């Protein structure tokens, strides 16, 4: 009697499932996970890089006790924050209190999906890339609002309100500052914007847009000197004063991920992304090298700003945005549009 085999051979079944499209999707997922992991590692390493650079500029040693020349300080910090008590106060809204750091971390990492590291390396190649970035930035505002309100602490609430007002205001200037680049390129796709700079980086025709983008980028990431939402002297660390353990770590790493993100956007929008300077053609240097060098330069500028600039008052920050940044971005956009109409009337 012959028995009909109903269950197929498992290896052959899996092999039949692994079509070309399946392998493509699997490769894309693995590549995305690797890129996100590298971004988190770079953001964590920037913490130590910042501490060592600030120590160098201030004529002191910095962290140098854990490992040779302090090389294992990052590992020690990660272990310390991982094993700290993840304490939630009784008077908080526990759901919102837990959701806030997760939203902050998720939006920061998700925004990296649009960043083209090289012609072939990146998570997604979307025509709405810049719009996706602003969508994630808009959602990120809720993270600090949730954290400030759910903590049931007056310092947290004031820090959350400050952060929301500052972020929403400077996101307007951030968007207007790069509209000149979008007008020159005719695309919201970052890969197309980088490729359009093959004949010249946009830092020259969009210099004032770049300056406004730098200021707005620092304000949106809540970095010094625009760190009023976390002002230690006034608000005792602001909206995350009640956080500890990994929840605080997610807020902390999320801030540095945003610094890397804004630095990468500056590289792509104004400095040619992965393109070599002066159209140099050096075969043994991959395009991703130029992208990383430019991004590291802007990350260093964030550190330099922290070590050299004083923190203005909150009202001065808001006045500077609406009375200086907004007019500059609007004038830059109008001049860019006029130049395009005069020299390219068919567009």
Curated annotation (Swiss-Prot):
Q: What is its EC number?
A: 7.1.1.-
Q: What is its main location?
A: membrane
- For this protein, the parts annotated as crossing the membrane are 25-45, 95-115, 128-148, 168-188, 200-220, 251-271, 284-304, 324-344
Q: List keywords of the entry alphabetically.
A: Cell inner membrane, Cell membrane, Membrane, NAD, Quinone, Translocase, Transmembrane, Transmembrane helix, Ubiquinone
Q: Which reaction does it catalyse?
A: a quinone + NADH + 5 H(+)(in) = a quinol + NAD(+) + 4 H(+)(out)
Please give the GO cellular component terms listed in this UniProt entry.
plasma membrane
The record's annotation in InterPro entries points to: NADH_UbQ_OxRdtase_su1/FPO, NADH_UbQ_OxRdtase_su1_CS
Q: Name one GO biological process term.
A: aerobic respiration
Superkingdom, according to UniProt?
Bacteria
- A Pfam family annotated for this UniProt entry: NADHdh
Please tell me whether the keyword NAD is annotated for this protein: yes
Location(s) in or outside the cell: Cell inner membrane
Molecular-function GO terms, alphabetical? NADH dehydrogenase activity; oxidoreductase activity, acting on NAD(P)H, quinone or similar compound as acceptor; quinone binding
Membrane topology, as annotated, equals: Multi-pass membrane protein
Q: What is this protein for, i.e. what is its function?
A: NDH-1 shuttles electrons from NADH, via FMN and iron-sulfur (Fe-S) centers, to quinones in the respiratory chain. The immediate electron acceptor for the enzyme in this species is believed to be ubiquinone. Couples the redox reaction to proton translocation (for every two electrons transferred, four hydrogen ions are translocated across the cytoplasmic membrane), and thus conserves the redox energy in a proton gradient. This subunit may bind ubiquinone.
Please give the NCBIfam families that the UniProt record associates with this protein.
Answer: PRK06076.1-1 (NF004740), PRK06076.1-2 (NF004741)
- What does the similarity note say? Belongs to the complex I subunit 1 family.
How it assembles, according to the record, is:
NDH-1 is composed of 14 different subunits. Subunits NuoA, H, J, K, L, M, N constitute the membrane sector of the complex.
Name recorded for this polypeptide: NADH-quinone oxidoreductase subunit H
Naturally occurring in which organism (per UniProt): Psychrobacter cryohalolentis (strain ATCC BAA-1226 / DSM 17306 / VKM B-2378 / K5)
What gene, per UniProt, encodes this protein? nuoH
